[in-house]
A protein has these predicted regions:
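Signature of uroporphyrinogen-III synthase
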Residues: 1-234
Length: 234
């Protein structure tokens, strides 16, 4: 039976591990891109709208960063963002109805037709500029704050490289979380089964280059993830 390796940050990893182990799978939690948070108080002024480009951009913000409570609209790119906003600040976070991507969030903002007013975009260094470009194209009063950066965890990368020599199921919720594997010439991608979050504007790898590519709509549906792994490894 193939091992299952989680290479992304995931708030429900304990529940996933328990469910997989109850089905006799070996589970490994090995992030290969660590998140280094560089700003705990990025909300430095009053903003009518705050846009959160990824969950990592909100996780480490200090809950005493009071300006967030005065925002009229808080937008997030998907369920993980909404979960963290609710957990840390007990506030509502508007997300796309189904397309959890930069493009999907822009379409949601357009559909809502709110007057965004002064807007703050929270993102990571090297992250996509799709939303930033949209704000600029609309001539909206906005600031951009890079809250975190991704740092390669070489020890975990070496561990994963050795572990997947004979194949594995790799769970990754963003392209950035798995890029070190894709660019490693020592890895035979055709032995790897990837389970990824379905983002319409983010193609992680051509399907023909890997053993299989399975897309998730809801990363919090643990039974669905386990069933997909069973289908891959049967």
């Amino acid at each position: 039976m193939l091992d299952v390796i989680l290479v992304s940050n995931y708030s429900m990893k304990e529940e996933l591990e328990q469910s997989l182990k109850s089905n006799d799978y070996k589970f490994h939690d090995l992030m290969i891109q660590d998140i280094n948070h560089i700003e705990r108080y990025p909300i430095d002024d009053e903003y009518k709208t705050i846009i959160i480009q990824s969950a990592n951009a909100i996780k480490k913000i200090d809950s005493s960063n009071n300006h967030i409570y005065n925002a009229k609209y808080i937008y997030g790119i998907g369920p993980n963002c909404r979960s963290w906003v609710q957990r840390k600040f007990s506030l509502d976070c508007i997300i796309p109805d189904h397309d959890y991507s930069s493009s999907g969030l822009i379409e949601k903002i357009k559909h809502d037709k709110y007057e965004l007013g002064k807007t703050l975009l929270l993102k990571g260094i090297g992250g996509k500029t799709t939303i930033q470009n949209f704000l600029e194209s609309e001539n909206l009063d906005h600031n951009v704050c890079n809250v975190y950066e991704r740092v390669l965890n070489e020890d975990n990368l070496h561990s994963v490289t050795a572990m997947i020599e004979n194949g594995a199921v790799v769970i990754a919720f963003s392209k950035s979380s798995v890029e070190p594997l894709l660019h490693n010439s020592d890895i035979n991608l055709d032995r790897l089964h990837f389970i990824v979050l379905d983002k319409s504007d983010e193609k992680i790898k051509c399907d023909k280059d890997v053993a299989s590519m399975t897309k998730l709509v809801d990363i919090y549906d643990i039974p669905d993830i386990v069933e997909k792994i069973k289908a891959i490894t049967k």
